[in-house]
């Protein structure tokens, strides 16, 4: 049997426990309860000879089990998570005010059943492995979604840049048309000035040949 002992406690107050072996597991477990930090949630393991005490503390409620060293960590902690959920679901807020062993008569049977299940039923490890794979897939999905969102942001940024480029192109064309118009008008003015200058030069030359500005010799 992989799991041999289990308890549920609030701080150092044991609310329910069950043992499947004649050892001093209960004594050691209560000593461990005094060492577990009282403020933070934690998952820890303590080695004792060929046994390991696994402890899960969540929201002030501590679930502990003693398992054979060969059981590893996955099955014991899956057991602790299962027990924690069952206990909270069954007793709710009563766990915060219950006296020592107040739930033992009823819940010790649940501990016994779940110890037997997680120790002997091959489906227990299979289900835990599937849960682990599902969590891994969920993590990959979240990662992929994050990447898609990141690509979406880059796409949105690219669209914004394209819109800016189009706006710049429109402004450039407008400025180019205005520049061409200004150049054309300058050319027209310059042409008119050149024609007028040429006419003045011709007039001066003719006036010189015709002996006066009124052109008396040529009229």
UniProtKB/Swiss-Prot annotation:
Residues 7-111 form the Longin domain. GO terms for cellular component: plant-type vacuole; plasma membrane; vacuolar membrane. The chain crosses the membrane at residues 190-210. Residues 126-186 form the v-SNARE coiled-coil homology domain. It is found in: Vacuole membrane; Prevacuolar compartment membrane. Its main location: membrane. Residues 2-189 are cytoplasmic. The modification N-acetylalanine is found at residue 2. It is a single-pass type IV membrane protein. Disulfide bonds: none annotated. Residues 211-219 are vesicular. Expressed in flowers, leaves, stems and roots. Keywords: Acetylation, Coiled coil, Membrane, Protein transport, Transmembrane, Transmembrane helix, Transport, Vacuole. GO terms for biological process: membrane fusion; protein transport; response to abscisic acid; response to salt stress; stomatal movement; vesicle-mediated transport. The longin domain is essential for the vacuolar and subcellular targeting. Belongs to the synaptobrevin family. This is Vesicle-associated membrane protein 711. It comes from Arabidopsis thaliana. The gene is VAMP711.
């Amino acid at each position: 049997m992989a799991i041999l002992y289990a308890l549920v406690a609030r701080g150092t107050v044991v609310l329910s426990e069950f043992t499947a072996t004649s050892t001093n597991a209960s004594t050691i477990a209560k000593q461990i309860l005094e060492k577990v930090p009282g403020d933070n949630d934690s998952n820890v393991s303590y080695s004792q000879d060929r046994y390991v005490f696994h402890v899960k503390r969540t929201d002030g409620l501590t679930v502990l089990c003693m398992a054979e060293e060969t059981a590893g960590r996955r099955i014991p902690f899956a057991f602790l998570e299962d027990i924690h959920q069952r206990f909270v679901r069954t007793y709710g807020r009563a766990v915060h005010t219950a006296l020592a062993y107040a739930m033992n008569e009823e819940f010790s049977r649940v501990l016994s059943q779940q110890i037997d299940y997680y120790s002997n039923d091959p489906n227990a490890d299979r289900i835990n492995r599937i849960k682990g794979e599902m969590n891994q897939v969920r993590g990959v999905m979240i990662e992929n979604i994050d990447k898609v969102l990141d690509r979406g942001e880059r796409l949105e940024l690219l669209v914004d840049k394209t819109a800016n480029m189009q706006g710049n192109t429109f402004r450039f064309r407008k400025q180019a048309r205005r520049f061409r118009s200004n150049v054309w008008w300058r050319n027209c003015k310059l042409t008119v000035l050149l024609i007028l200058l040429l006419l003045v030069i011709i007039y001066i030359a003719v006036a010189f040949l015709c002996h006066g500005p009124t052109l008396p010799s040529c009229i």
